[in-house]
């Protein structure tokens, strides 16, 4: 990448880092904060690498400039020496010899042609055009811009400096101090001082067609920061548009017709063939592809895990030019399927992990072919049946002979109640332990419900997705609390029955 692309990428990364830091200060859940902090660290590392690359490019450019100057001086001395050897020396004209430092090359025909073309380029100053913009992720986008003035590129080609009228990034937003001639940062400014564009790449200016905008359509809307952000129209009323920005950090706004325009990118349903074949849509973004790439089919839903999050990862990918269904990378040659995480046992070697996975696979295969076994009666905490007498034996035998009665081996609610009625001391202790654990779970669930309610109160009216997520968690916690209450009542009933039997049998 050249110096301009590296500077643009650096500004984009810094803007993304600022958005992540703003999101961290919004008071999110612990899991979302962990993801954002990891993303923050990755962006900082990426910024450091980009700065190092930019410094290396500038250093190499400076060294090449110095070497070129030395080479030109050597060629100029050799040229003077060749002229001195070929031209005859006139003794009478020695005093009229022109010094070497005053010798100037005669202008060539190409230089004269460029001087003749300069007035035509100066006429473009102040004109509105459709100028290209190469983003940091390798896409070519055409934006409406205004020509500031004519300049000459390093290779001598005719170029103009343009300022973009609808900036979507800080790197495209015109610097207000540069327009007044007071900017102190010059090339290091994070705002735009204009971009050099070849005259051959300019296209005619196209006014935005607001008739394409309607309720539910995507658009670009101007925010208070002066940038145009992607949004979606929710309502249209007498020339006023109510838009909802795609970014969760931006609130819903009402704008007029001069602060809204159709999106620069075509919809995802449009094919690349229609993009290249339709000349009327030339103002939209064009993705530069060196060749046709077979992206393959994705058998799994891309970013399916983001139903549990705010989807910051896929939104950053879309901002960097990624199109769903295509592979990663500049030419869409990367992987399509997401990487599935495999959690291995902690503290085990790779051989032991492989052996454990093989055992699990074999168990799954054998378990699928083995018929399900009948569940036994619930084992008692003491591991032995309750004491029985001769009357219990006779009752079981007589009831088993009566038609319509349950079998002796079937575990019925009456039998469970009777077993609990004759429960031993260890069974009562286990019952008390279960009741204590259930009460602890109820207290913990109540604390969770209070915490969720406080978070829901804080986020009401601020973050719609966060509020819905918290409401869902609150409903689940309340359902769990109801189940625990029912379990507690059942355990208390069993405990009272056991206490009643103890009081009636002790004299």
Curated annotation (Swiss-Prot):
This is Zinc finger CCCH-type with G patch domain-containing protein. Residues 309-355 form the G-patch domain. It comes from Rattus norvegicus (Rat). Interacts with CHD4/Mi-2; the interaction is direct. A zinc finger (C3H1-type) spans 170-196. The modification Phosphothreonine is found at residue 276. The modification Phosphoserine is found at residues 272, 349. Transcription repressor that specifically binds the 5'-GGAG[GA]A[GA]A-3' consensus sequence. Represses transcription by recruiting the chromatin multiprotein complex NuRD to target promoters. Negatively regulates expression of EGFR, a gene involved in cell proliferation, survival and migration. Its ability to repress genes of the EGFR pathway suggest it may act as a tumor suppressor. Its main location: nucleus. Residues 112-123 have a biased composition (Acidic residues). Residues 487-507 have a biased composition (Basic and acidic residues). Keywords: Acetylation, DNA-binding, Metal-binding, Nucleus, Phosphoprotein, Repressor, Transcription, Transcription regulation, Zinc, Zinc-finger. Residues 94-111 have a biased composition (Polar residues). The lineage of its organism: Eukaryota, Metazoa, Chordata, Craniata, Vertebrata. The keyword Phosphoprotein applies. Residues 88-125, 264-283, 359-389, 486-507 are annotated as: Disordered.
């Amino acid at each position: 990448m050249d110096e301009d692309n590296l500077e643009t990428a650096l500004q984009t990364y810094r803007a993304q880092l600022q958005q992540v830091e703003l999101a961290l200060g919004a008071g999110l859940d612990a899991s979302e904060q962990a993801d954002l902090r990891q993303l923050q660290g990755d962006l900082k590392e990426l910024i450091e690498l980009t700065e190092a690359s930019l410094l290396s490019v500038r250093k190499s450019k400076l060294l090449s400039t110095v070497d070129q100057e030395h080479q030109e001086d050597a060629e100029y001395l050799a040229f003077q020496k060749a002229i001195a050897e070929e031209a005859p020396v006139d003794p009478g004209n020695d005093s009229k010899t022109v010094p070497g430092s005053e010798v100037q090359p005669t202008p060539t025909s190409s230089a004269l042609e460029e001087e003749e073309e300069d007035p035509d380029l100066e006429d473009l100053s102040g004109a509105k055009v459709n100028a290209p913009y190469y983003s940091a992720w390798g896409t070519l986008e055409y934006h409406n811009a205004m020509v500031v003035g004519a300049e000459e590129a390093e290779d001598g080609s005719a170029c103009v400096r343009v300022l973009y009228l609808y900036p979507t990034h800080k790197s495209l937003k015109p610097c207000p101090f540069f327009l007044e001639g007071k900017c102190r940062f010059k090339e290091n400014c994070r705002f735009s001082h204009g971009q050099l564009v070849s005259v051959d790449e300019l296209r005619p200016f196209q006014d935005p067609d607001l008739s394409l905008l309607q309720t539910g359509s995507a658009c670009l809307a101007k925010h208070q920061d002066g940038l145009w952000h992607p949004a979606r129209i929710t309502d249209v009323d007498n020339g006023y548009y109510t838009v909802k920005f795609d970014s969760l950090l931006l609130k819903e706004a009402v704008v007029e017709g001069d602060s809204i325009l159709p999106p620069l990118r075509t919809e995802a349903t449009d094919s690349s063939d229609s993009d290249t074949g339709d000349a009327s849509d030339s103002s939209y973004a064009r993705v530069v592809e060196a060749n046709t790439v077979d992206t393959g089919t994705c058998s799994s839903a891309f970013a399916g895990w983001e139903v549990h999050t705010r989807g910051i990862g896929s939104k950053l990918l879309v901002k960097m030019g990624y199109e769903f269904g295509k592979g990663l990378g500049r030419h869409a040659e990367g992987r399509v399927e997401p990487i599935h995480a495999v959690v291995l046992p902690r503290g085990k070697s790779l051989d032991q992990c492989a052996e454990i996975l093989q055992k699990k696979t074999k168990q799954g295969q054998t378990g699928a072919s083995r018929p399900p076994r009948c569940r036994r009666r619930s084992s008692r905490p003491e591991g032995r049946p309750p004491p029985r007498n001769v009357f219990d034996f006779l009752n079981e035998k007589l009831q088993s002979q009566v038609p319509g009665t349950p079998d002796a081996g079937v575990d019925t609610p009456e039998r469970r109640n009777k077993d609990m009625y004759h429960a031993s001391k260890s069974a009562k202790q286990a019952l008390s332990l279960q009741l204590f654990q259930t009460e602890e779970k109820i207290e913990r669930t109540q604390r969770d419900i209070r915490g969720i309610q406080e978070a829901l109160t804080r986020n009401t009216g601020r973050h719609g997705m966060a509020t819905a997520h918290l409401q869902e968690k609150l409903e689940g916690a309340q359902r769990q609390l109801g189940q625990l209450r029912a379990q507690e009542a059942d355990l208390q009933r069993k405990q009272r029955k056991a206490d009643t039997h103890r009081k009636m049998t002790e004299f």
